[in-house]
Design a protein with these regions (language model features):
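Conserved catalytic/switch belt of AAA+ P-loop NTPases
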Residues: 45-68
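Interdomain motor-coupling "hinge/lid" segment immediately C-terminal to the ATP-binding subdomain
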Residues: 73-192
Length: 330
């Protein structure tokens, strides 16, 4: 398919050839043309400019890896202002539940008060939530969990992590790729601390901020981590009070974090006092990714020395909303 885009930039010629290739008519305003893995064909990315300008009556949807789109190709112009962006996130718990048990999902969505749930629903929702925390929201892993294929969940998540490691090498210089890998692999250790604050010494003994700032920025821009900065004063606007030198980082997905930390699924299924120490980190990661997936900017936290801390603070209009996360009963 990419050869078609390499040989011409004329949208009508491209559509005609794609129609021949697929043996399907591509009709204006009636056919949705989907170009998957578009990051592998930079010529197709550039062609979107001409689709927008010359044939806006054709509807085209492109899907691609943020890594490939952000870092993959030099010398090709991105059609700025010619495409609408939709950022995709890991599957949320509600989306997972809808596919796992539609009737339970309908009950879950009908909950509109903070009243205790009937035991029968509480138990079923707890089981579903445990399953979600094990698999996380990466679509292939979540589907394996819905199919009750626990081994498939583990294989899928490990394959994704392996693919990320290969992407580090593919899309960065050798020195930067090495530093990216060090930061990424330090994530479980960073979150194992009580205050979760990022410490460069956990990346590598003797590490300094100026050596690893680019690696952190790379991971953030690639969508693999979230960076949550300290806000000294919880007042609007939060950005005016943030301390960029003090921050926490979280994984894009709680399932990936679990596997990156080498925690087996059984950790969720047994009452292990050792695991309780890490439960808080996983709970915070879950809340963060859920808020982000629902359009909430969650890039600040508040702390008052060693006395008190609120895991996340969110600016909503002229108000600051505190989000405190508890992983157990309190």
């Amino acid at each position: 398919v990419c050869d078609i885009f390499r040989k011409t930039k004329n949208p009508l010629q491209i559509i005609e050839q794609l129609s021949y290739l697929t043996s399907e008519p591509i009709l204006p305003q009636k056919t949705l043309l989907i170009l998957d893995e578009i990051q592998d064909c930079p010529e197709a990315i550039s062609a979107m400019k001409y689709f927008c300008e010359k044939t806006p009556e054709y509807v085209v949807a492109c899907a691609g890896s943020l890594l490939g789109l952000a870092f993959g190709h030099q010398g090709f112009s991105f059609p700025v202002g010619k495409v609408d962006h939709i950022k995709m996130y890991p599957v949320t718990f509600s989306e997972f539940l809808e596919q796992r048990d539609e009737r339970l999902y309908q009950y879950y969505m009908s909950i509109d008060s903070l009243e205790p749930l009937p035991d029968v629903f509480f138990d079923r929702l707890s089981q579903a939530f445990t399953a979600y925390r094990i698999s996380g929201g990466m679509p292939a892993a979540a589907m394996k969990m819905i199919e009750k294929d626990l081994s498939g969940v583990e294989t899928t998540l490990r394959n994704i992590l392996q693919d990320y490691s290969l992407d580090f090498v593919k899309h960065a210089t050798p020195l930067l790729a090495n530093r990216i890998s060090h930061v990424w692999k330090s994530l479980p250790s960073q979150l194992a601390k009580e205050n979760r604050k990022f410490v460069y010494q956990l990346v590598r003994p003797g590490a300094r901020a100026r050596e690893y700032e680019d690696a952190l920025t790379w991971l953030k821009n690639a969508g693999l981590i979230y960076k949550v900065s300290l806000c000294s004063t919880p007042q609007v606007p939060l950005k005016s009070y943030e301390d960029l030198s003090i921050f926490k980082i979280y994984s894009l997905d709680v399932g990936l974090l679990r596997v990156l930390a080498d925690l087996s699924p059984e950790a969720y299924l047994v009452d292990n006092p050792i695991f309780k120490e890490y439960k808080g980190a996983l709970a915070e990661n879950y809340i963060l990714q859920s808020l982000v997936a629902n359009g909430v900017n969650c890039s600040h936290y508040w702390a008052s020395g060693n006395k008190a801390e609120v895991e996340f603070i969110v600016q909503r209009g002229l108000e600051v909303v505190p989000v405190e996360v508890k992983s157990g009963i309190s």
